[in-house]
């Protein structure tokens, strides 16, 4: 059993390393099509990692405990980025509680809100969110620099940027949710095929013994 766990852990580590590389490349590209393709592949690998961790936890619950962690959402657009973090967390089966605290030291003494999101769920799912969110946030920040619109400054420009963040967050949720469903379906198909093979082997053995 220990050897099996170590083997799965090694494969999971390889998946996570590749996800980091894909997301880093997605941050650096100016091509929307390439970025989307890289994010799509990263989502698939993150989903596969989740399946690996669930399989390990089914053998030993201590390998993936329920816990919580707090994430301070950085400015600018901290309130809007809670939507991105929340969508990632929801797609990866976490519960999120968001709180705000007035910080008078922000904005050169004018004050501002500190926004904190508290994530609840399995450790492996929290790790997946912690892996994805910083990279995807960086992608959004890079995209905001290219947001077009009639408003060049002021409230109108801020509204355009908030709309961009919301659209990006929505697309990420759909991509991750689809990857999760596809990974679970593939794992179920694999388990069904293995069960059928085992049953067929037993039937063959029974016939051979007659």
Indicate where each model-derived feature is located.
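Short, charged, low-complexity amphipathic alpha-helix
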Residues: 1-40
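Generic, well-ordered alpha-helical scaffold segments in large soluble proteins
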Residues: 22-25, 41, 45-48, 87, ...
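Extended, helix-rich structural scaffolds rather than catalytic motifs
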Residues: 1-13, 50-210
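Short amphipathic alpha-helical coiled-coil/interface segments
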Residues: 19, 35-49, 165-172
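Short amphipathic alpha-helical segments enriched in hydrophobics
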Residues: 30, 46-49, 53
């Amino acid at each position: 059993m220990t050897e099996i766990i170590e083997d799965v852990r090694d494969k999971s580590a390889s998946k996570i390393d590749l996800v980091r590389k894909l997301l880093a490349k997605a941050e650096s590209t100016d091509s929307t099509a390439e970025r989307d393709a890289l994010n799509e592949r990263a989502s698939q690998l993150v989903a596969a990692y989740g399946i690996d961790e669930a399989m390990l936890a089914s053998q030993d619950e201590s390998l993936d405990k329920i816990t919580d962690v707090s994430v301070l959402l950085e400015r600018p657009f901290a309130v809007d980025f809670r939507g991105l973090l929340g969508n990632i967390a929801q797609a990866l089966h976490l519960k999120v509680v968001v709180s705000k605290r007035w910080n008078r030291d922000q904005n050169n003494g004018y004050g501002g809100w500190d926004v904190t999101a508290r994530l609840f769920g399995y450790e492996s799912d929290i790790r997946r969110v912690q892996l994805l969110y910083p990279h995807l946030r960086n992608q959004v920040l890079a995209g905001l620099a290219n947001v077009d619109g009639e408003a060049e400054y002021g409230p109108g420009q801020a509204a355009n940027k908030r709309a961009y963040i919301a659209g990006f967050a929505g697309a990420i949720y759909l991509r991750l949710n689809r990857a999760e469903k596809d990974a679970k379906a593939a794992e179920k198909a694999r388990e069904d095929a293995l069960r059928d093979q085992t049953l067929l082997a037993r039937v063959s053995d029974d016939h051979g013994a007659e």
